[in-house]
Amino acid sequence: MTTPGKENFRLKSYKNKSLNPDEMRRRREEEGLQLRKQKREEQLFKRRNVATAEEETEEEVMSDGGFHEAQINNMEMAPGGVITSDMIEMIFSKSPEQQLSATQKFRKLLSKEPNPPIDEVISTPGVVARFVEFLKRKENCTLQFESAWVLTNIASGNSLQTRIVIQAGAVPIFIELLSSEFEDVQEQAVWALGNIAGDSTMCRDYVLDCNILPPLLQLFSKQNRLTMTRNAVWALSNLCRGKSPPPEFAKVSPCLNVLSWLLFVSDTDVLADACWALSYLSDGPNDKIQAVIDAGVCRRLVELLMHNDYKVVSPALRAVGNIVTGDDIQTQVILNCSALQSLLHLLSSPKESIKKEACWTISNITAGNRAQIQTVIDANIFPALISILQTAEFRTRKEAAWAITNATSGGSAEQIKYLVELGCIKPLCDLLTVMDSKIVQVALNGLENILRLGEQEAKRNGTGINPYCALIEEAYGLDKIEFLQSHENQEIYQKAFDLIEHYFGTEDEDSSIAPQVDLNQQQYIFQQCEAPMEGFQL
């Protein structure tokens, strides 16, 4: 028997008669659920501050009342974005006016170009260190802001470019600037720190170790303009993100109280990033899940499953799904928030990734106790799951298969009969021909649970006939199980052999009926025998 762990929760001990709840509950598997791609599509880990059209025609005016318009004329960029000797000379001059003018010119290079010359900037000796030095100029907030903007855009680049900003000592200074009296400076510092934390787990942990959280959370305690709140919660989500390794929970858990009220902000960007942060914090052991539950966010997360923007629904669903990977009591908290009605609605979503995530979430609920399985039945969810099992994309069918097999593993006799009456046997048999060995095992396990119930019924009613054997044969399941006796996976062929021997008896095999392989559909093809037109000759 393999050792339990996050990566093998799904397939532990298939030789057992049933999976226990801890084994049936499944945390996310990166490989199967294509999370990295989805996250890239729905959430940016780095953002470049690009000048707007208005900013291209006039110098920026710091929004705080204490700022005055910079009295600097627009300067022409060098052809091709090349850094000129004049720019370098001005950046190192002692004149504050020339320093600001040159910094603005660097900023424009890094924010206006489709492919900003970040490498050229960081390879110019002393320039990055000079911008970091400008961050300290409390007497010149405009210079602080412009240099912070430059460094933000450098940190929006690749890991090597981000590391240059870190090595120049910018992070502790940016954290100090979170307490600046000027909101523009604060906001640009938040943006820079979000880019740095979003680069890698190593950068994230370094920013956390520099004690960013207290001043960052303090920003939320006052009335901010919307862009500030957006940037701050985005930076917060980057600080919570990452699994290899996750951030030290004690360092990020203080943000839970702030996240709980951010869920009630109406802006979709704020909502989305707050939900992403909660999904990261709830992705782990039960003690982390409990901390998220204790923050009082569950009911609001469930409400957000019905939001009209998928940008919010996706991370809210991820967070809800992570919470139900916990124990039965933790799962019940979500059920008590009327989550099943929302999940049923999401099963008909036109967005396939939402359907898949909803099926995954339900599969962890059906891994619970019989009362919880009954709530799924009462919510009329299984008909939708069986429909998905027959018609959806394969990645979604896989999750629906888990939901149904989990219910057959932990359900009562009446609950399993209900699933059979809904028609779960045929789609489970259809999965026996797919190339994904894990899902073949899931389907075999579900069928075994059904056959075991049939055996008990046969003994109880004295007929000696297992009523479910015939249903499996009618669905061409027996042919498929027989073929699996030659499967390359040892657990699959052993399971197939055991099922044939125990429930169907032994029959001579005909090698001529071995199925062909359809590589496009990732499954085997079983030819259905047809009678001759004139009928069989006796």
Swiss-Prot record:
Residues 1-36 are annotated as: Disordered. Gene3D superfamilies: Importin-alpha, importin-beta-binding domain, Leucine-rich Repeat Variant. The gene is KPNA1. The modification Phosphothreonine is found at T3. One of its GO terms (cellular component) is NLS-dependent protein nuclear import complex. It is found in: Cytoplasm; Nucleus. Belongs to the importin alpha family. SUPFAM superfamilies: ARM repeat (SSF48371). Its main location: cytoplasm. Residues 318-406 are annotated as: NLS binding site (minor). This is Importin subunit alpha-5. InterPro entries: ARM-like (IPR011989), ARM-type_fold (IPR016024), Arm_3 (IPR032413), Armadillo (IPR000225), Importin-a_IBB (IPR002652), Importin-a_IBB_sf (IPR036975), Importin_alpha (IPR024931). Residues 20-36 have a biased composition (Basic and acidic residues). Residues 245-437 are annotated as: Binding to RAG1. The keyword Protein transport applies. The keyword Protein transport applies. GO terms for molecular function: nuclear import signal receptor activity. The modification N-acetylthreonine is found at T2. The lineage of its organism: Eukaryota, Metazoa, Chordata, Craniata, Vertebrata. Pfam families: Arm, Arm_3, IBB.
